[in-house]
Swiss-Prot record:
GO-annotated molecular function: protein-N(PI)-phosphohistidine-sugar phosphotransferase activity
Domain PTS EIIC type-3, chain residue ranges per copy: 8-421
Compartments in which it is found: Cell membrane
Membrane spanning stretches: 31-51, 72-92, 104-124, 138-158, 187-207, 223-243, 246-266, 291-311, 349-371, 402-422
InterPro entries from the UniProt entry: PTS_EIIC (IPR003352), PTS_EIIC_3 (IPR004501), PTS_IIC_cello (IPR004796), PTS_Sugar-EIIC/EIIB (IPR051088)
Record-given protein name: Putative permease IIC component YwbA
CC annotations in GO: plasma membrane
A Pfam family hit: PTS_EIIC
Annotated organism of origin: Bacillus subtilis (strain 168)
Length: 444
């Protein structure tokens, strides 16, 4: 066993395994994923507002009127602007499910606690005035969307931990045996639900006595802003990608773990770009969820489409040629488990090097392209991660060819990175096959 393999197995894999199995991180990941169907549906309507087809705008105006773009925005806003509320339910549901307690009740209580922590005030600018005032009684849509994700996460984890503790301590109302199960479960949730609401209410009253005024401001200033700066920077993104690739190298789904941590940051950046795109303003963010899914991980984590193409074109080994044929179909849809585990890349010191380096270089190249204005930034459109390259880059930028061109550039970069390492691996496999065919098992 090589020193590298021994260090990976003895030092890194145990820690990575514990992180991967951590129930709270799993709940964050799986709970936030619950928002994706709605976001993708909203993104379809967002794409329809900006199709670069001659005569398209005139046709839409003739059908829906001059405000057709605003009308297409209705389902966009309805899906994006409840992101935090859906996440509050989903995270609580998944965490309660992992504890074996009633997940539906936990999710409902989490939503109530989240809304209780959210001030029902909206800014209003009176006619003829240049300054806005806060008016009570309105639902603050911005806080129910991406801006409220951090609070939704914390509330969901906090409320579910209290909920399961009280349930497991059996501090509940017990109904007679003849009561229907659905009714019985609802009464079981009464005491933990009351305690959670009471605690969140008291916390809100205390916070309102401070300059912060709301939990959203506390979390935004103390947690959200620093993390957003980190996740929205080149250095922070390189670190996140490096850790993700290192976890994959141990056979652990790095995207699930790092995605669960960084999702609220990158989702928030995505939504900020979406709002700017709808308003026709400059897009503020580069590092969003789509930045990594569309431009960095072309072919899957580690940008392995380049490796598969190299296998198809340059393999001497029969095993590598066959694996390339099997892997090209999934790779075009950004699915690369057959390559990661079949080649394998996992626990393979030779191939781990380009597997880690390739996405780090494409992050840097794409950042340079977007920051200089040569490449359009992601427009906040949630293109499915399984969308084939070139098409996905075009759609994710709101119909800009530069998005597809950047994907092609990244593919060429990653081909150049993988090629020398693959040649060594392919030659080794070819010699092993030659030894078997010649009957000389000692040939290396």
């Amino acid at each position: 066993m090589s020193t590298f393999t021994r260090v990976m197995e003895e030092k890194i894999m145990p820690v990575a395994g514990k992180i991967a199995g951590q129930r709270h991180l799993s709940a964050l990941r799986d709970g936030i994923i619950l928002t994706m169907p709605l976001i993708i549906i909203g993104s379809v309507f967002l794409i329809l507002t900006s199709l670069p087809i001659p005569g398209y705008a005139d046709f839409m105006a003739s059908v829906f009127g001059n405000e057709w773009a605003d009308k297409l925005g209705y389902p966009v806003n309805a899906s994006f602007d409840i992101m935090a509320m859906i996440a509050a339910f989903g995270i609580a549901y998944r965490l309660a499910e992992s504890y074996g307690v009633d997940a539906l009740s936990a999710g409902a209580i989490s939503i109530a606690a989240f809304l209780l922590a959210t001030p029902f005030e909206v800014p209003f600018t009176p006619h003829g005035s240049t300054e806005s005032i806060m008016v009570g009684g309105g639902i603050p849509i911005t806080l129910l969307g991406s801006k409220g994700l951090f609070v939704a996460m914390l509330i969901a984890l906090f409320s579910t931990e209290i909920y399961r503790y009280i349930i497991q301590k059996n501090i509940v109302f017990k109904m007679p045996d003849g009561v229907p199960p659905a009714v019985s479960k609802s009464f079981v949730a009464l005491i933990p639900g009351f305690i959670i609401v009471l605690l969140v209410w008291l916390a809100r009253l205390l916070i309102e006595m401070t300059p912060f005024q709301s939990l959203h401001n506390v979390v935004g200033d103390l947690l959200g802003t620093p993390l957003s700066i980190l996740g929205g920077s080149l250095g922070g993104s390189l670190i996140a990608e490096f850790v993700q690739m290192l976890l994959w190298s141990c056979g652990i789904h790095g995207a699930s773990i790092i995605g669960g941590i960084m999702a609220p940051i990158w989702y928030g950046a995505m939504d900020a770009n979406r709002l700017a795109f709808q308003a026709g303003e400059a897009l503020p963010s580069i590092f969003t969820t789509q930045f990594f899914q569309i431009w960095i991980n072309v072919g899957g984590s580690g940008a392995t489409l380049a490796l598969v193409l190299t296998m198809l074109v340059r393999s001497r080994s029969k095993q590598m040629k066959q694996l390339g044929r099997l892997g090209i179909g999934p790779a075009l849809f950004n699915i690369n488990e057959p390559i990661i585990f079949g080649m394998p890349i996992v626990m393979n010191p030779l191939l781990i090097v380009p597997f880690i380096i390739a996405p780090l270089l494409t992050i840097t190249a794409t950042y340079i392209g977007m920051s200089t204005g040569l490449v359009a930034r992601p427009a906040g459109i949630a293109v499915p991660w399984t969308m084939p390259p070139l098409i996905s880059g075009y759609l994710a930028t709101g119909g800009k060819v530069s998005g597809a061109v950047m994907q092609l550039v990244n593919l060429l970069i990653t081909c150049a990175i993988y090629y020398p390492f693959f040649r060594i691996w392919d030659h080794q496999k070819w010699r092993e096959e030659s030894a078997v065919e010649s009957g000389d098992k000692n040939v290396m």
